[in-house]
């Protein structure tokens, strides 16, 4: 985007009114130091374009199980295999660090997330996740009803959320100040509708919406919600309050990288209902760390790091009469090696399978094209001090949102440390919600470090006029395939079901197969597929 003016760049990502106001203020750089970090887009494009290598005959190794992909699903599969007493496997990860969109970073100030940054406290029914958190030392036993008790230091501390609107910060994410009686009536009606679905059970006693998705009801009354968007569902009920629509839209952009017009009504209701135990109670408390879900990544990685090969890519999976040949190279596409596996757990997205699984290259299954991914820009801003706060403002929270901004705002990495003064790191999230995911990826990648720094700083400057003087470093990560998009018709269409079926000796395990890109889903599919593969070898 080097040929565009500052105003044109700001208008493209923040809208014309913000761009015009910013240019009138004439608060252009100086810029802080920083860079674009992270994912190997160049190597991924080489795979897409048909990278081919030959493995020398003396560079082959036999191993029962190969796991392709070191995100949460792949790491969970490795964790489960080891807990089950199975240690003869190899995990291949292209990047120099595991975790996928749950990875994290650190500097002299604090550790910080590069993507996913919390999980809701699990309910007792999620036995495996409760077991993991107990192993991590996060839990302190059970309450009288058998629900896990999370240690206070791991729960998101107050204040949790605030929203910026017309020059002031307010508590919470729904904009209560200035709400009309009609706004309030519609909010109450929306919550009543949610209560009905939270209470709902099918003939087998299953909830309509719960975590993980694999335990949700597939009753026709529930799956019918996937045929319309959440905006259409709201319109049918007269729920058109601008504040309410914005709040639901924010939720969809936050969890799915999609707008209310794009998001399936099933997915929209899932967001609000799956984390609530019963009507009238708060959503499950949030578990978080300074580095977000990177804490879980580090725990899982440490459990099996001697079986993980980082900076190594699986470039071809060749199904044989018995087993699979896995061709791997380093990040430069050199040093080819081969693994002869009895089973492969493909813990990478379906769009990669069409380039890596040899039979898919010439004749990819129809379902592969149904998996669409959203693009995100995540930036970490290292500040020498906190932005100034007006006495009338609600104080700095963990999650800080700008009303009517296309961004999601930022989380504060030092919040869990209990430090409310001095240096900090703000993690800023910007989902690209274009209707066409390819256009979104093009916009993401065409904007360089300077453009993204200008977008984020201009956006934040509305709430923090002193932000530019406080930023010491501004680093960017561009996620071209950040998360699956649960668009209308996808959740209960055929693609997820077909994508989950093994192809000969290749078993698929990625959060996309649940339709929503949440930690619980990646954990669940990694667990289930690892057990499926383990039992197949017994």
Outline where the language-model segments fall.
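Extreme N-terminal leader/targeting segments of oxidoreductases
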Residues: 2-64, 83
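Conserved flavin/dinucleotide-binding core of flavoenzymes
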Residues: 25-54, 166, 172-178, 323, ...
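Glycine-rich Rossmann-fold phosphate-binding loop(s) that bind the pyrophosphate
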Residues: 69-71
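N-terminal Rossmann-fold NAD(P) dinucleotide-binding loop
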Residues: 74
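Glycine-rich FAD pyrophosphate-binding loop
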Residues: 82-105
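Dinucleotide-binding Rossmann-like beta1-alpha1 core, especially the glycine-rich loop
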Residues: 109-197
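Active-site/ligand-binding neighborhood in enzyme catalytic cores
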Residues: 202-323
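Mid-domain catalytic core of redox enzymes
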Residues: 310-425, 463
